[in-house]
C-alpha cells in the first residue's frame, strides 16, 4: 500500500486557513482519532457479538437473534441498553472500593491495547517502538482487576474465579510473550508497523505463519486462554462457580466485564493478523504492484483515501476470519479441568515456546 500524502497535513492546511494554531490542531486531532477508534472498536464488538450468537445458533440448530433489527443485528445494542437501565447492586459485606474499581481496571487496559494496532500504515494511534510488548504489559494488568473484583465481592465463588483468572493468566502470558519475541527476532523490531512491513514482499508467501508455525499454534492457544474462552473459561465456569468473579455484579459493572471479554478477543484476533497474517497487505503475491500502478493514475488525495480504506478492510477481513475459528472452537470443544489447564500451560506450551525461540535465535545468528 502507498501513502504519498499524509491526510493529517491536508486537514492541518485547512484548519490553518481558519486561524487555528498547530498545537490546538494537534490536540483536536488526537481527540478526534481517539473518538473514531473507540467508535470503530465498539461497532466491531457489536458485530462480533452478533456473529457469535448467529454462529452458535447455527451449530445448535437454533435461529438466534431475530427480532431486534434485521436478522437481530442490534441485539447486542439492546442488551447494552438493558444493562445500562438495571440496578447497580453492591454486596453489603464486600469491599466497596475493590468491588467498584475491579471492572474499570479490567476494561481500561484492553482499550489501551488498541493504541498500538495498525489498521493500515498510517492508521495507528501510537506507533511505539515497543508496540507488541506494550500490549503484553497492559494486558497483564487485567488479572489484577479480576482478582480485586473477586475478593471485593465477599463471595467464595467470586474469589475462586478471581484466583483462577490470575493463575490462568500467569500460566499463559509467558508462552504468549515468547511467541511474540520470536516474531520480533524475525522482524528485527518490536513495532507493530515494522512487523507488518516485514511480511509485505510476496503476499501470503511472506507471512510469518509459514516461518513460525509452532509459534502460531502456541500463540493461538495462549490467546484463547488469555481471553478465557472455551475450553479455557475456568474462571467463570457456570457448573462450578455460578459465574465466577461476575457473580455479584449487575448493571453497568457487569457490562464492563462483558465488553472487556469481547474487546480482548478482538484484540487477540487483530494481533494474529498483524503478527502472522501480513496485516493490511494484499495476500496475492505481486498483486500490490498492480494496485500501486492503478492508484498512481488517480489523484493523490483519492488514492490516499482508497488505499487506507482497502487496507482497513483487509485487516478486518483477516481478523474476522480468525474470530470465526475462535467461535467455532468455543462451541465445539468441552471445558478442561483446572489441573489440565495448568499442565498444558507450564508443561507443554512453555517448553515448546522456549524451544521455538531457541530455534529462531539460532536461525537468525546463522544468517549473520
From Swiss-Prot:
It comes from Marchantia polymorpha (Common liverwort). The chain crosses the membrane at residues 27-47, 97-117, 130-150, 166-186, 204-224, 249-269, 270-290, 305-325, 348-368. GO terms for biological process: photosynthesis, light reaction. NDH shuttles electrons from NAD(P)H:plastoquinone, via FMN and iron-sulfur (Fe-S) centers, to quinones in the photosynthetic chain and possibly in a chloroplast respiratory chain. The immediate electron acceptor for the enzyme in this species is believed to be plastoquinone. Couples the redox reaction to proton translocation, and thus conserves the redox energy in a proton gradient. Its EC number is 7.1.1.-. One of its GO terms (cellular component) is chloroplast thylakoid membrane. Pfam families: NADHdh. Belongs to the complex I subunit 1 family. It catalyses: a plastoquinone + NADH + (n+1) H(+)(in) = a plastoquinol + NAD(+) + n H(+)(out); a plastoquinone + NADPH + (n+1) H(+)(in) = a plastoquinol + NADP(+) + n H(+)(out). It is a multi-pass membrane protein. This is NAD(P)H-quinone oxidoreductase subunit 1, chloroplastic. HAMAP family: NDH1_NuoH. It is an enzyme of class 7 (translocase).
Amino acid at each position: 500500500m502507498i501513502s504519498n500524502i499524509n491526510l493529517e497535513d491536508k486537514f492541518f492546511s485547512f484548519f490553518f486557513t481558519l486561524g487555528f494554531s498547530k498545537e490546538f490542531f494537534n490536540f483536536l486531532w488526537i481527540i478526534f482519532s481517539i473518538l473514531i477508534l473507540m467508535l470503530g472498536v465498539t461497532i466491531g464488538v457489536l458485530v462480533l457479538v452478533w456473529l457469535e450468537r448467529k454462529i452458535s445458533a447455527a451449530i445448535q440448530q437454533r435461529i438466534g437473534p431475530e427480532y431486534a433489527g434485521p436478522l437481530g443485528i442490534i441485539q447486542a445494542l439492546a442488551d447494552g441498553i438493558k444493562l445500562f437501565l438495571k440496578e447497580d447492586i453492591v454486596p453489603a459485606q464486600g469491599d466497596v472500593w475493590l468491588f467498584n474499581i475491579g471492572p474499570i481496571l479490567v476494561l481500561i487496559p484492553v482499550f489501551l491495547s488498541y493504541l498500538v494496532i495498525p489498521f493500515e500504515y498510517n492508521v495507528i494511534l501510537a506507533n511505539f517502538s515497543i508496540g507488541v510488548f506494550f500490549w503484553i504489559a497492559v494486558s497483564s494488568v487485567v488479572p489484577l482487576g479480576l482478582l480485586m473484583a473477586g475478593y471485593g465481592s465477599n463471595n467464595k465463588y467470586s474469589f475462586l474465579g478471581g484466583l483462577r483468572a490470575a493463575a490462568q493468566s500467569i500460566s499463559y502470558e509467558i508462552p504468549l510473550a515468547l511467541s511474540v519475541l520470536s516474531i520480533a527476532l524475525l522482524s528485527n523490531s518490536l513495532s507493530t508497523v515494522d512487523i507488518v512491513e516485514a511480511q509485505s514482499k510476496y503476499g501470503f508467501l511472506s507471512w510469518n505463519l509459514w516461518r513460525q508455525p509452532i509459534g502460531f499454534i502456541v500463540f493461538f492457544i495462549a490467546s484463547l486462554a488469555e481471553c478465557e474462552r472455551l475450553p479455557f473459561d475456568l474462571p467463570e465456569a457456570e457448573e462450578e462457580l455460578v459465574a465466577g468473579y461476575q457473580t455479584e455484579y449487575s448493571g453497568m459493572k457487569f457490562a464492563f466485564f462483558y465488553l472487556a471479554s469481547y474487546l480482548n478477543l478482538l484484540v487477540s484476533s487483530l494481533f494474529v493478523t498483524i503478527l502472522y497474517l501480513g496485516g493490511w497487505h494484499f495476500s496475492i503475491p505481486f498483486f500490490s504492484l498492480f494496485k500501486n500502478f492503478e492508484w498512481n493514475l488517480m489523484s493523490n488525495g483519492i488514492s490516499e483515501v482508497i488505499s487506507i480504506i482497502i487496507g482497513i478492510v483487509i485487516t478486518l477481513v483477516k481478523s474476522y476470519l480468525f474470530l470465526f475459528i475462535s467461535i467455532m472452537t468455543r462451541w465445539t470443544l468441552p471445558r478442561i479441568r483446572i489441573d489440565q489447564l495448568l499442565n498444558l500451560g507450564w508443561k507443554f506450551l512453555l517448553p515448546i515456546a522456549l524451544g521455538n525461540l531457541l530455534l529462531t535465535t539460532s536461525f537468525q545468528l546463522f544468517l549473520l
